[in-house]
From Swiss-Prot:
Stored InterPro entries: TPR-like_helical_dom_sf (IPR011990), TPR_rpt (IPR019734)
Gene Ontology biological process: anaphase-promoting complex-dependent catabolic process; cell division; metaphase/anaphase transition of mitotic cell cycle; protein ubiquitination; regulation of meiotic cell cycle; regulation of mitotic cell cycle
Protein name, per record: Anaphase-promoting complex subunit CDC27
GO cellular component term of the entry, any: anaphase-promoting complex
Keyword annotations of the record: Cell cycle, Cell division, Cytoplasm, Mitosis, Nucleus, Phosphoprotein, Repeat, TPR repeat, Ubl conjugation pathway
Subcellular location: Cytoplasm; Nucleus
Additional notes on this entry: Present with 593 molecules/cell in log phase SD medium.
Repeat is among the record's keywords: yes
Main location: cytoplasm
Quaternary structure note: The APC/C is composed of at least 13 subunits that stay tightly associated throughout the cell cycle: APC1, APC2, APC4, APC5, APC9, APC11, CDC16, CDC23, CDC26, CDC27, DOC1, MND2 and SWM1.
TPR repeat coordinates: 154-187, 472-505, 540-573, 574-607, 608-641, 642-675, 676-709, 710-743
Outcome after substituting T351A: Abolishes phosphorylation
Gene from which this protein is expressed: CDC27
Organism expressing this protein natively: Saccharomyces cerevisiae (strain ATCC 204508 / S288c) (Baker's yeast)
Bias (Low complexity) ranges: 247-289, 365-391
Length: 758
């Protein structure tokens, strides 16, 4: 065996200045043991052995291959053991010597929100090497060393996209995530990031053109991509990386004269503050390879690059097989007529929402018609003013507005014991991976754009039943989608199915808890909160569930403390800030509520529920113009939400624009004909405009939707009296009196008016 001059003065066994084959063999054996421990998830063992390897190789020259490999394995072990700060410090010093070290440094920077600029510079330098088809010897050595967890080009681009998003550079983040998808169409987190930025991708190209090519390439290289593993000499699986395709002149021989990773033109730029502008520039080779552009509309939610040069460079820097379109929500806000067309195309639900929304958060079940009555505020109304019973009933539902996630009705079977027939095997199981991923991507895009009807239709028509019924992601999405359109019964069934599949699940439980809050189900809410407190006491979702339970018990101060605990555990948890703001609003603390809503928007600019909260706070203060701006901003993010549309109409009504407000209410009724809120608001406005015949028709439809609501019957009876239908008026007012005995005085006054009529 040839002696490596780098190890000549080094002996592992005794530490004396001599070198033999045994020393090199021990180094390799340590590397294999570390990687085997990592593969077996024995991270403590990996960290201990990596410390030994790091210490023993510390006397080598810092340009040594064995030294850089030792640093990488040590940093990787620390990172996997969640010692992020130590891994960050170790990898920071040597990030320019090794691809893997630079990758770990970037991961730590993302995790800790430290050194993000420096990490971007380093990763850009590495990607530039690959983009220029460089035959850099050190990189080829890393790629051919079979080291565990060496990233491929798609992963590097995904990490770069996440780092740019950490800096609120949406345009650059979208570019690198699109690059990642162009290389690996199944890198789901990149597509999730793109949807979160409300960008669009040509999904057919991604999942059929690119995926087809990758599938053929994978079949041709399967044997070489996955070498056999031996316990005696551990050989981790090599990543099926595209680097081997990029580096066509790759050299498998180790060149002992190569001492640095980046040489001459490949050396990384300086990491000083003045050099950060280089982050804004893409490599020349990337621009030459790209033909597709990112188009960004100017808006407050989309961050624009600080360096103007990035605009022109990014515009021509997208891969050929992907099309991106970063769009401002406000720039795509449809008109009233166009929204109606969208609804007609996407109308699907067989079980439409039928919840009457109110501040008292009440929920009652009717066994005859399955409609829910949430309007019991009039129970405490003893005023003689005829308008009090109307003004007492409000329909604001802050918690069903969220930005950020069941048993099915047709089956009571345990999903683990599903029996699959031959017909299902031939139909449902015949779907290909690109097809199922394409459909999932369509669903995620529709969901991120709040097109809930379309997403539900895609689930029903495109996703095989065995996947839809047993995959937690599908159950979560369906639960969220039905929750978003206020179809609480269906949402509850999907979340119940999810809890059956994963009883210890904590992710997305804050949405389930809010659903139970709307249904006024204290028992299930208590069981959920207590169960999570026993198993996951340090999760922010747990404290959101506790906060919702306390809010349900009318203990708003304790609920605020619970939501504060959630934000302490996760300072970027936008939904927790919003829920905290709702509690402050319930305590009439408008300033504190606004502060919480603004914190939520700082975490997530697309969190439309926070804009809704700001709007309701402004309405309470009589600032109707400001409220309208906030509601319109929320509607620009979620243009088909009937609650937001009604809020816009309410603001316009307060400002005296009744005709315009009526258009909003009509739009809400058209988008969701079963929305009791929109029917109530439109009927009340028509009544105030003395359009009694149209108002009468609207109130009749409202009574059909909520037959157990006293206010609906009262309004209908009052309108009957005005149009001269005395007998019908007495009938409806009598029903209202029976449903709401505490509101008798107001109803009695109206009955007296009926009897005074001829």
């Amino acid at each position: 065996m040839a002696v490596n001059p780098e190890l000549a003065p080094f002996t592992l066994s005794r530490g004396i200045p001599s070198f033999d084959d045994q020393a090199l063999s021990t180094i390799i054996q340590l590397q294999d043991c570390i990687q085997q421990a990592i593969q077996q998830l024995n991270y403590s063992t990996a960290e201990f052995l990596a410390e030994l390897l790091y210490a023993e190789c510390s006397i080598l020259d810092k340009s040594s291959v064995y030294w850089s490999d030792a640093v990488y394995l040590y940093a990787l072990s620390l990172f996997l053991n969640k010692s992020y700060h130590t891994a960050f410090q170790i990898s920071k010093e040597f990030k320019e010597y090794h691809l893997g070290i630079a990758y770990i440094f970037g991961r730590c920077a993302l995790q800790l929100s430290q050194g993000v600029n420096e990490a971007i510079l380093t990763l850009l330098s590495i990607i530039n090497v690959f983009s220029s088809n460089s035959s850099n010897t050190r990189i080829n050595m890393v790629l051919n060393s079979n080291l565990v967890h060496i990233p491929d080009l798609a992963t590097l681009n995904c990490l770069l996209g996440n780092l740019y998003m950490k800096l609120d550079h949406s345009k650059e983040g979208a570019f690198y995530h699109s690059e990642a998808l162009a290389i690996n169409p199944y890198l789901w987190e990149s597509y999730e990031a793109i949807c979160k930025m409300r960008a669009t991708v040509d999904l057919k190209r991604v999942f059929f053109d690119i995926a087809g090519k990758k599938s053929n390439s994978h079949n041709n290289n399967a044997a070489s991509s996955f070498p056999s593993t031996s316990l005696s000499h551990f050989e981790p699986r090599s990543q099926p990386s595209l680097y081997s395709k990029t580096n066509k002149n790759g050299n498998n021989n180790i060149n002992n004269n190569v001492n640095t990773l980046f040489q001459s033109s490949n050396s990384p730029p300086s990491t000083s503050a003045s050099s950060f502008s280089s982050i804004q520039h893409f490599s020349r080779s990337q621009q030459q390879q790209a033909n597709t552009s990112i188009r960004t509309c100017q808006n407050k939610n989309t961050q624009t690059p600080k360096n103007p040069a990035i605009n022109s460079k990014t515009s021509s820097a997208l891969p050929n097989n992907i099309s991106m379109n970063l769009v401002s929500p406000s720039s795509k806000q449809p008109t009233i007529s166009s929204l109606a067309k969208v609804y007609n195309r996407n109308k699907l639900l067989t079980t439409p929402p039928s919840k009457l929304l109110n501040n008292d958060r009440n929920h009652q079940n009717n066994n005859n018609n399955n409609n829910n009555n949430n309007n019991n505020n009039n129970n405490n109304n003893n005023n003689n003013n005829n308008n009090n019973i109307i003004n007492k009933t409000t329909f604001k539902t802050p918690r069903n507005l969220y930005s950020s996630t069941g048993r099915l009705t047709t089956s009571k079977k345990n999903p683990r014991s599903l029996i699959i027939s031959n017909s299902i095997l031939t139909s449902d199981y015949s779907i290909t991976l690109p097809e199922i991923m394409y459909n999932f991507a369509l669903i995620l895009r529709s969901s991120s754009q709040y097109n809930s009807f379309k997403a539900i239709r895609l689930f029903e028509s495109q996703i095989p039943s065995h996947i839809k019924d047993t995959m937690p992601w599908c159950l979560v999405q369906l639960g969220k989608l039905h929750f978003e359109i206020i179809n609480y019964d269906m949402s509850l069934k999907y979340f119940n199915r999810l809890k059956d599949l994963q009883p210890a699940r904590v992710k997305d439980m804050e949405i389930f808890s809010t659903l139970l809050w709307h249904l006024h189900d204290k028992v299930k809410s208590s069981n959920l909160a207590n169960g999570l407190m026993d198993t996951m006491p340090n999760k922010p979702e747990t404290w959101c569930c506790i906060g919702n339970l306390l809010s349900l018990q009318k203990d708003h101060d304790a609920a605020i403390k619970a939501f504060e605990k959630a934000t302490q555990l996760d300072p970027n948890f936008a939904y927790a800030y919003t829920l905290q703001g709702h509690e402050h609003s319930s305590n009439d603390s408008s300033d504190s509520a606004k502060t919480c809503y603004r914190k939520a928007l700082a975490c997530d600019p697309q969190h439309y529920n926070a804009y809704y909260g700001l709007g309701t706070s402004a309405m309470k203060l009589g600032q109707y113009e400001e409220a309208l701006l906030y509601f319109e901003k929320a509607r620009s993010i979620n243009p088909v939400n009937v609650v937001l549309i009604c809020c816009c109409g309410g603001s316009l009504e307060k400002l005296g624009y009744k005709e315009k407000a009526l258009q909003y209410y009509e739009l809400a009724c058209h988008l969701q004909p079963t929305s009791s809120l929109s029917k109530y608001k439109m009927g009340q406005l028509l009544y105030s405009m003395t359009r009694y015949n149209v108002a009468l028709q609207t109130f009749e439809e409202l009574v059909k939707l909520v037959p157990d609501d006293a206010t609906a019957h009262y309004l209908l009876g009052q309108t009957y009296r005005i149009v001269g239908r005395k007998k019908d008026a007495i009938k409806e007012l009598t029903v209202a009196m029976n449903l709401d005995p505490k509101g008798n005085q107001v109803i009695i006054d109206e009955l007296q008016k009926c009897h005074m009529q001829e």
